[in-house]
Swiss-Prot record:
Organism lineage: Eukaryota, Fungi, Dikarya, Ascomycota, Saccharomycotina
Organism of derivation: Saccharomyces cerevisiae (strain ATCC 204508 / S288c)
Pfam families for the chain: Spt4
Gene behind the chain: SPT4
Keyword set includes Cell cycle: no
Protein name per UniProt: Transcription elongation factor SPT4
Main location: nucleus
């Protein structure tokens, strides 16, 4: 069983322990503002991994909408739905589960 989880908002992949200890390095402020726990906003079910060394210079990072995020491993697709409290704070939110077609 894998202990990795992916953030449903930014897609960063970390261990369960890292999320529990530090929260999401990109999204923790939003989760705190919404009053939800990091674990409610992460999923153990995700597909594909992309390593980002320099997100600000990567076309893949721009495609995944993480070009303003920290370097790390990112999931291409994350299964699950963010709590409504988080979605309400994000007028331009696009789910990472593939449910929204552009």
């Amino acid at each position: 069983m894998s202990s990795e989880r992916a953030c449903m908002l930014c897609g960063i992949v970390q261990t369960t322990n890292e999320f529990n200890r530090d929260g999401c390095p990109n999204c923790q402020g939003i989760f705190e503002e919404a009053g939800v726990s990091t674990m409610e906003c992460t999923s153990p079910s995700f597909e594909g991994l992309v390593g980002m060394c320099k997100p600000t210079k990567s076309w893949v990072a721009k495609w995944l909408s993480v070009d303003h995020s920290i370097a790390g491993m990112y999931a291409i697709k994350v299964d699950g739905r963010l709590p409504a409290e988080v979605v309400e704070l994000l007028p331009h939110y696009k789910p990472r589960d593939g449910s929204q077609v552009e």
